[in-house]
From Swiss-Prot:
Residues 388-410 form a coiled coil. It comes from Trypanosoma cruzi (strain CL Brener). This is Protein SEY1 homolog. The keyword GTP-binding applies. Probable GTP-binding protein that may be involved in cell development. The chain crosses the membrane at residues 736-756, 760-780. GO terms for molecular function: GTP binding; GTPase activity.
Length: 877
């Protein structure tokens, strides 16, 4: 047997051998390409789609099935040579494509229908494949009907039209007419129809061909065949759903007769030519293919996998479900196409990756990628449009998602390259933000007033106050009771302020789809992107990706800084103590002239250090997704990558669940370590507890032992710093003995008289004396500020300030004087501070003066020094 496609001659294929082995998928594909006259690996099968048909034939052995197919379709199936033997010729199943080139009339001309079909075949459309199945009731198989049943089920799963080859003289008989084969066909098709997903449109055409018909009237034979079919149908066991159904529910029954092949050859050929029109001439009244495509809806490029899957299920004696097989085929084919397209897109993106590694940056990268993604999706839809729509849509969505992942990976590599430059520009700003927040914290911490014993008794618990009273009884010094609630509120405010400030820096990098705000941001972000500014401005997805990388990097940088501060907690809070001790709240350097001033500021400085220790206990910043909702018109025209990245924007917030709000140090006094929050549930790193109301162990920077150790070292360092300050104060005291002035007047009388008698020298001496007098008065005023009554000091300050304002209003300052004054009184905290611009809140005690504390000692060294100062006047008296 041979098959032709546009005149090309090809050998047929042994689809199923006599041992029941199906031709491999690759072999079936190779045959189909050859039958279509196309080279392997092209899209010929895909172009055919479902516009093809399959015709199969079943019947008894040696009943002339192959001969009938050769005459009808021009195939070259092997036929039996009666002169040599009688027996089995077709073993298993053979497949071939219909060849109408050799089908000509007696005059040698091809009939009109065949000519039309030839033109159709030449146009690569509506191919017709013919399957010749092994005959039944053969001596070779004996009583084994399992293979017969398997072939019947396979034929019903693939053939649009199933020819039943039957001798006319056997009509009315059971065994001779091979009615057992019909019973098998009915049963297996009933098995197929039993599935819920089976549709009534998927019933094959059962065409009964009565061979060697010599009578004139055909109606009697057709009625007899129908009665035989009905009797078989009534005797088989049917499912409940088909109890009252007829055979027409499962089959479209058609009948035809043909004259004797040998005795009436001319009539046989004539009737065969007419019969052939049933298969290709759509204008024929008996045309069999009412739909343009294969009735199972399996595309030709999926037929190899479909046949393999069906035959495997049949051979394993499993329940064959054609819709399920089509679903499996659709899924397999869609996954195959998806894999191919994904590989092509990955190779496409790898070219840009290589260019990036060479330092070449491509403009409009996302637009190029989006265009290729659209092309790939159209290609996928084109190759899978004939399969089940729900599976195609699902796989297409999966493909689009995976293509987006590959695209985002490439955009991420570009963003990572550019974000390294952006981080260099932002590093100073981020460090300044953290420094500004710490300065604000210490500024507010030293303004928190201490509680009196009564206030502490009213605000604290019984256990806490009993502890304070025991401390008071054990020490003769005053106890500075820390306002625990206010300190913890300040710690929380510090983290909120830091989050807002960092978020303000990061938001400059994100796209703003409002044109008004976009123009305002362009000038601010130009310096951040440096030479990549124009590249980023033209690609919103790249800008979003850069912002994501920078957000994560800023978060990691700040977290590492606080982790480093926590590792050296004692040194960190001691530096804060020194900063508060040595600088005024306006940032100017503080000089101490008396020990009383040092005594007054030391508790505030120690409290500021302890508040900072509370900030180092737990890292309260976390990154969450900022679910920004944009209008459709705002995101119209954006790429998939940009829209996806919009949904993953980062936002820095403060950790403040119910347990984290309780996870603060408990302050009692400045002379004892803060109590650790032991009762809070802490989630382990690998814990299965996914509750939100827990404390994250990864964010706990200080353990209970670390807090105690840091406090002990902090106390020692503060004592040492106080000793250095006391030595500095003592070194500045240079009082001359009382007898020095009279001796100077006595010995220098002549020089004094000479100066008084000389006007020039007198003026010079007066000027020098005025300068020294001014310095002396300023020094005495500083001492008075430190030791005098607060009400008097504040009153004098107000009067002096009013006099200065009046003087400035009457006598304008020169430009040089203005510059020098600004330089002299510049506040170190007034430099570019992101926290000041990003957050408009302030601490309630920020405007208040430092609390005036009663003169008392806070350390052993300072106590001894004060006692020594009090004993000196007594000894002189």
């Amino acid at each position: 047997m041979v098959a032709f496609a546009g005149g090309a001659r090809t050998e047929d294929a042994h689809l199923i051998d006599d041992e029941g082995q199906l031709l491999p998928v690759n072999g079936i594909e190779e045959y189909l390409f050859t039958a279509l006259g196309a080279s392997r690996g092209g899209d010929a099968l895909h172009r055919v789609g479902i516009t093809y048909h399959v015709v199969g034939v079943l019947g008894g052995q040696s009943s002339g099935k192959s001969t009938l197919l050769n005459c009808l379709f021009g195939t070259k199936f092997q036929t039996m040579d009666e002169t040599k033997r009688r027996g089995q010729t077709t073993k298993g199943a053979f497949i071939s494509r219909a060849n109408f080139e050799v089908l000509r009339g007696d005059d040698g001309e091809m009939d009109a229908g065949a000519s039309a079909l030839m033109e159709s075949c030449a146009g690569k459309s509506l191919p017709l494949f013919v399957v010749d199945f092994e005959g039944t009731d053969g001596f070779e198989r004996g009583e084994d009907q399992s293979f017969e049943r398997q072939l019947s089920l396979f034929a019903l799963s693939v053939a649009d039209v199933l020819l039943i080859n039957m001798w006319a003289v056997d009509v009315g008989r059971f065994n001779a007419a091979n009615m057992s084969l019909l019973r098998t066909i009915f049963e297996v098709n009933l098995q197929l129809f039993s599935h819920d997903s089976y549709t009534k449109e998927e019933k094959p055409t059962l065409l009964v061909v009565l061979r060697d018909f010599t009578e004139v009237e055909t109606r009697t034979h057709f009625e007899t065949v129908r009665k035989s079919f009905d009797k078989i149908w009534d005797n088989i066991v049917k499912p409940e759903a088909f109890k009252n159904s007829t055979i027409d529910t499962l089959f479209d029954l058609r009948y035809h007769v043909l004259p004797h092949f040998k005795l009436q050859r001319a009539a046989f050929d004539k009737e065969t030519a007419k019969f052939r029109q049933w298969f290709y001439l759509s204008t024929c009244d008996e045309y069999l293919f009412h739909t343009r495509g294969m009735f199972r809806g399996v595309p030709l490029d999926g037929i190899p996998s479909y046949l393999s899957s069906c035959w495997e299920m049949i051979r394993k004696s499993k329940d064959l479900d054609i819709p399920t097989q089509r679903e499996m085929l659709a899924r397999h084919r869609c996954l195959e196409v998806k894999k191919q397209i994904l590989q092509l897109f990955t190779e496409f993106c790898s070219n840009y990756t290589e260019r990036l590694q060479r330092g070449e940056l491509v403009t409009h990268l996302t637009s190029l990628l989006e265009q290729d993604v659209d092309d790939k999706l159209r290609d996928f839809h084109q190759q899978t449009r004939l399969y089940r729509i729900d599976i195609v849509r699902k796989t297409e969505a999966e493909l689009e998602e995976e293509l987006l992942k590959v695209e985002l990976k490439l955009v991420g590599e570009y963003a990572k390259f550019i974000s390294s430059k952006v981080l260099e520009e932002l590093e100073t700003a981020v460090s300044g933000t953290v420094d500004g927040a710490l300065r604000w914290l210490l500024h507010q911490a030293q303004s928190i007033p201490f509680l009196s014993a009564e206030a502490g008794d009213a605000g604290g618990g019984t256990e806490h106050m009993s502890h304070l009273k025991s401390v008071e009884r054990a020490s003769s010094n005053d106890v500075y009771i820390t306002d625990n609630e206010t300190c913890n509120v300040l710690v929380h405010s510090f983290w909120k302020r830091l989050c807002r400030a960092l978020q303000a820096e990061i938001e400059l990098l994100y796209c703003d789809f409002s044109q008004q705000h976009q123009r305002q941001r362009e000038s601010q972000t130009l310096n951040l992107y440096d030479r990549y500014a124009s590249l980023v401005a033209e690609d919103p997805a790249l800008q979003e990706a850069i912002a994501h990388f920078v957000s994560d990097a800023v978060f990691q940088k700040v977290s590492r800084r606080f982790a480093s501060m926590a590792e050296n907690a004692a040194e960190t809070i001691h530096q804060a103590f020194e900063g508060v001790l040595n600088r005024n709240q306006d940032g100017t350097v503080r000089f101490f002239h008396t020990t009383k001033a040092l005594q007054r500021i030391e508790p505030q400085a120690r409290q500021a250090g302890l508040v900072l220790l509370g900030c180092l206990l737990y890292y309260r910043v976390k990154v969450v997704a900022d679910r920004v909702v944009y209008k459709l018109e705002d995101t119209d025209g954006l790429s998939r990558a940009a829209v996806h990245l919009l949904g993953e924007r980062r936002k820095l917030i403060v950790r403040e669940n119910s347990e984290e709000q309780k996870f603060f140090l408990h302050y009692a006094t400045i002379s004892e370590a803060p109590r650790y929050p032991i009762g809070a549930p802490v989630a382990e790193t690998d814990s299965a507890d996914t509750s939100d109301n827990v404390v994250d162990r990864d964010c706990v920077l200080l353990s209970q032992q670390a807090v105690q150790r840091a406090f002990d070292l902090y106390t020692q360092k503060c004592e040492f710093t106080m000793q250095l300050q006391l030595r500095s104060i003592e070194g500045e005291k240079q009082n001359l003995p009382a007898w020095v002035l009279p001796v100077l007047l006595l010995l220098g009388w002549n020089e004094i008289w000479y100066v008084l008698s000389s006007p020039v020298l007198l003026v010079v001496v007066v000027i020098i004396a005025a300068v020294f007098l001014r310095g002396f008065l300023l020094t005495q005023w500083a001492i008075f500020e430190e030791t005098g009554p607060t009400c008097v000091v504040v009153g004098v300050r107000v009067v002096v300030q009013q006099i200065r304002n009046i003087y400035k209003a009457l006598v304008p300052m020169m430009p040089d004087d203005v510059k020098s004054n600004v330089a002299r009184h510049r506040d170190p905290g007034s430099f570019s501070d992101v926290t000041a611009s990003a957050v408009g809140t302030s601490w309630p005690y920020a405007a208040a003066e430092p609390t005036v504390l009663p003169p008392s000692t806070t350390s052993a060294t300072l106590t001894r020094r004060l006692k020594k100062e009090e004993e000196v006047p007594t000894q002189k008296e």
